[in-house]
């Protein structure tokens, strides 16, 4: 309920501000694109920065399958089914935008005693790794749909072809690694370097490179980064509210939200065959949308009209279904045996988002 409130309340305030000020056409402003890119950068870096690498290695096959095959499968199930139902290829893009599991919301349920430590570790890594994958997919899906519909391409960062952007991400990762190698013994310098990398990623839109850098650029800024990610979530929800003055598409939003949750059920069960039944059920019902889905919808709105009108109610639908489904599941389930295992990815003011300052 708290996670849902962090979405609904700022969005409601944003909507009230938009009505009071008569704000409109914000998505066409260069400042709008800059702000949404900053929010995306903070969210992605926070996602991978918080992954507990030692625990993720234990189930790396399941995690890799979830964030590659799983994300592609979920995006295809959602996008293709709705594109056919509504006869609109834009749903191929929207399917990608909601295909990830929100890491902040997932962290809030990791304390569930009915989930085993292994399932918690898988969910934490899954929800963190799938964010950069969906960002990458959304960029390419948006380009394909924009070309098919004759919509101008969204100009961000390095520009040029997507091959150029891929090359820019590779260079970014190389620079990040060299910086880590030279600065790993200087914590304060490493913290400044991390901020510089975020700024560079915003400038050149090298979000995949930034997400990879979060796996090894890990200065002692856990508390500050946690606050920044929470602020980015609230800021993104507020901006979402600012753009809701033109109304929402309730029917399409219901369909998108239901399809996103159904896709997680299908993929979650398919990829966790070796886990106990209780863990499989919790992972299958783990779909929640939050910061990444909101920010992707903000970016896509600058290119396609009507994106937020569909995605905003879809996010609400997904999170309400999650709340109801997991409440019913927990009433029937019994607590899993306790084990003294450090929990991966803890969101919140006092969370430890990073456990290592260097890769192993």
Model region roles, listed by residue range:
Residues 1-359:
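Transmembrane helical cores of multi-pass secondary ion antiporters/exchangers
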